[in-house]
């Protein structure tokens, strides 16, 4: 679990997302409250439930990006899902309980990676010994281990560590790969399919087979195999279940797309039906997974939606009450676009410059060009559909199309994009509303 303070979390988000201070503060406080709850005594801790967040704002203003960055900061089981992927229980499609199963899988993977990192050096040493056994078997008069190496084995060990034997082929015994069986289960029977898959995989458990590999590939394969032997899978499962129940975070995107349409009177299995199924999940229920039962009482749900065709009040009242914290994200202005093009650590202009640098082309953007690109993007958004910061991708691709095409032939040159270049390539398109609607 992350121990960062809300101020530190907002500072990290500021490196990648421009503006939207209110949304950043809300998610930062929610993330910090996970840590605060863990410090509270046991009887009261169980009574403290997370306050779920609903982020409302037009497309392209940073809702999904906040989720992506939060996943890296959380250091807790985290999953991002689209509400539109699910259908009501009993109909063809995925039911909402699969969210918790996927979250548990993410927790297993996260904890396994952490444990594997702890035994990395031991696994590397064990893999090295097995490769050396294939290259120079132990003589009966020499003891196993580095200190008891024969002179020939010591020489091969030095060459192996220097990388001189990377391309040499050796034969090693490795665990047989499990049988790959993909079982498509009907909705509600995913647990049965996973049990059947485990059954097929257990047929080959403990079996080995001889493979001929290059030393480089053998070291990598054996390191993974040795690390797998050193970590306790049962302990990982127990820790993952606990981490999901106490610190799990679910980011539910496109929530507005499952609002019921007023002009539609039939059964809406992928809209209101999904909302009804989400209710117990968000409120707190028990979900069966292949790792055990998961209680969802303390899982934090962060939902987001553009709500341009629907309103938050179009959600069923019970679900509205499950998201007590409402945050509105602001539409982006031309000044925001300027900041997006320059301020983030991996700004769009820096990305394009780095891509063209691989061809030997030095690309620079003048301040006047950045201001003009931002202004054109904002104007096109205002006149056509407002797609937020995603408009910058479209405009920059169009602007740099010619340079990108000819870059391989212009190696060693420097190109500076100024306002005149922008107007020459985009000015007429931006002014023509019909053209900009289809091209920009």
From Swiss-Prot:
CDD domains given in the database record: RecA-like_HslU
GO BP of this protein: protein unfolding; proteolysis involved in protein catabolic process
A GO CC term assigned to this protein in UniProt: HslUV protease complex
Listed GO MF terms: ATP binding; ATP hydrolysis activity; peptidase activity; proteasome-activating activity
Binding site for ATP: 18, 60-65, 253, 318, 390
Alphabetized UniProt keyword annotations: ATP-binding, Chaperone, Cytoplasm, Nucleotide-binding
InterPro entries associated with the record: AAA+_ATPase, ATP-dep_Clp_protease_ClpX, ATPase_AAA_core, Clp_ATPase_C, HslU, P-loop_NTPase
Matches recorded under SUPFAM superfamilies: P-loop containing nucleoside triphosphate hydrolases
Localization per record: Cytoplasm
Main location: cytoplasm
Family: Belongs to the ClpX chaperone family. HslU subfamily.
Subunit structure: A double ring-shaped homohexamer of HslV is capped on each side by a ring-shaped HslU homohexamer. The assembly of the HslU/HslV complex is dependent on binding of ATP.
PANTHER family: ATP-DEPENDENT CLP PROTEASE ATP-BINDING SUBUNIT CLPX-LIKE, MITOCHONDRIAL-RELATED, ATP-DEPENDENT PROTEASE ATPASE SUBUNIT HSLU
Protein task: ATPase subunit of a proteasome-like degradation complex; this subunit has chaperone activity. The binding of ATP and its subsequent hydrolysis by HslU are essential for unfolding of protein substrates subsequently hydrolyzed by HslV. HslU recognizes the N-terminal part of its protein substrates and unfolds these before they are guided to HslV for hydrolysis.
NCBIfam families: hslU, PRK05201.1
Protein name: ATP-dependent protease ATPase subunit HslU
Organism: Methylococcus capsulatus (strain ATCC 33009 / NCIMB 11132 / Bath)
Phylogenetic classification of the source organism: Bacteria, Pseudomonadati, Pseudomonadota, Gammaproteobacteria, Methylococcales
């Amino acid at each position: 679990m992350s121990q960062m303070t809300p101020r530190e979390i907002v500072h990290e988000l500021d490196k990648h997302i421009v503006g939207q201070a209110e949304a950043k503060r809300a998610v930062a406080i929610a993330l910090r409250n996970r840590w605060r709850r863990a410090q509270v005594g046991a009887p009261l801790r169980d009574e403290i439930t997370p306050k779920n967040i609903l982020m409302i704002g037009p497309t392209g203003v940073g809702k999904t990006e906040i989720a992506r960055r939060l996943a890296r900061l959380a250091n807790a089981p985290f999953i991002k899902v689209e509400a539109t992927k699910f259908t009501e229980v009993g109909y063809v499609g995925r039911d909402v309980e699969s969210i918790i199963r996927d979250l548990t899988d993410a927790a297993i993977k996260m904890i396994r990676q952490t444990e594997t990192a702890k035994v990395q050096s031991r696994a590397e040493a064990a893999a090295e010994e097995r490769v050396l056994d294939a290259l120079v078997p132990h003589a009966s008069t020499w003891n196993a281990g580095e200190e008891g190496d024969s002179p020939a084995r010591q020489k091969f060990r030095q060459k192996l560590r220097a990388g001189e034997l990377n391309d040499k082929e050796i034969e090693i015994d490795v665990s047989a790969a499990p049988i790959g069986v993909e079982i498509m289960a009907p909705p509600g029977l995913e647990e049965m399919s996973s049990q059947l898959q485990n059954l097929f995989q257990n047929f080959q458990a403990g079996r080995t087979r001889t493979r001929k590999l290059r030393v480089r590939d053998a070291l990598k394969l054996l390191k993974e195999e040795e690390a797998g032997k050193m970590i306790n899978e049962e302990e990982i499962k127990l820790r993952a279940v606990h981490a999901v129940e106490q610190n799990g975070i679910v980011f539910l995107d496109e929530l507005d797309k499952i609002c019921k349409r007023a002009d539609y009177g039939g059964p809406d299995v992928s809209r209101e039906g999904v909302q009804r199924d989400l209710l117990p999940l968000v409120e707190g229920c028990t979900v069966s997974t292949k790792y055990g039962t998961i209680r969802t009482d303390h899982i934090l749900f962060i939902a987001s939606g553009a709500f341009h065709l629907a309103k938050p009040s179009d959600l069923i009242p019970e679900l509205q009450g499950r998201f007590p914290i409402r945050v509105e994200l602001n539409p982006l202005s031309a000044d925001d676009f300027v900041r997006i093009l320059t301020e983030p650590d991996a700004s769009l202009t820096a990305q394009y410059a780095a891509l063209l640098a691989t061809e030997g082309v030095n690309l620079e953007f003048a301040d006047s060009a950045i201001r003009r690109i931002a202004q054109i993007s904002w104007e096109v958004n205002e006149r056509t559909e407002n797609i937020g910061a995603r408009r910058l991708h479209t405009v920059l691709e169009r602007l740099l199309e010619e340079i990108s095409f000819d870059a391989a032939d212009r190696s060693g040159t420097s190109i500076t994009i100024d306002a005149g270049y922008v107007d020459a390539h985009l000015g007429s398109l931006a002014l023509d509303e019909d053209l900009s609607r289809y091209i920009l």
